[in-house]
Structures are given as structure tokens and as C-alpha cells.
């Protein structure tokens, strides 16, 4: 009887762990979609990756929700870029129920279209994702960088 209990417990823990990993991978996929769009300098359709009431913070400032950030920050900024490339990208995600907490670390290089100047930075982003109708969406994103 003791052996059956131990086996059942181990199986239960394994199933829980697998489910957590699957959810973490799904949240990571959302972050990857956003990262890939930024690298392409084409964020068309990325609104679907964010909650309507999302909050975006960048380098100490509040950028409003994602729609506002896209219209007043990313959109205009991308017009000045020739390229944007992430390097050394790492992401860690912890899932707790309908919320996922992510930390991304990376370096990036931006090439400015006007004069081909390179801007090199190290960055970190923290995000809170929320499961909405079965899909992970970015609810809060905070990123900062340094030379």
C-alpha cells in the first residue's frame, strides 16, 4: 500500500510539473512573438499579445497601455531604425495560476537609418502575463537598458 501511495504521489507531482512547464513555454512563446516582431521592425498585429489595459514602463517612465506605446513610441522610433537585433537573449518564466512572471535579459544593437550609427545596449525586461480566454497576454511590461 505504501508503494502505491508513493508511486501515485510521484506521478501526481510529475503531471503538475509537466503542466507548469507547458504553461511556461506558452508564455515564453508570446514573449518570443513580440521579440521577433521588434527585430523585424514590424509590430503589425502585436496588439493581440497584450491585454487592453496593459501597462508599459520603459527606463523609468510610464508609457501608458500598449496601444499608446505603439502609437507614440515604437511606431515613430522604428521609422528611424535600419535594424534592431537581440543577442544573448535569455528568458525565465514562473507560472502561478492564471499569471506568469517573466524576466528577459539580453543585449541589443540598433542601427540608425540616417547615418548607420550603432547603438549597443544591455537590457532587462520584466513582464506579467495573464491568461485570458486560454491565451497568455502581456499585462505589464517594464524594460530598461544601459551601456
Task: Describe the predicted segments one by one.
Residues 4-13:
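Sec-dependent N-terminal signal peptides
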Residues 14-52:
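Short, low-complexity N-terminal intrinsically disordered segments enriched in polar/charged residues
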Residues 43-95, 105, 117:
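A solvent-exposed, acidic/Ser-Thr-rich amphipathic alpha-helical stretch
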Residues 98-108:
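A short hydrophobic beta-strand element
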Residues 109-113, 147:
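Sequence/structural signature of outer-membrane beta-barrel proteins
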Residues 114-120:
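A short acidic/glycine-rich loop-to-helix N-cap element
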Residues 122-147:
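Short beta-strand edge/turn micro-motifs at domain boundaries
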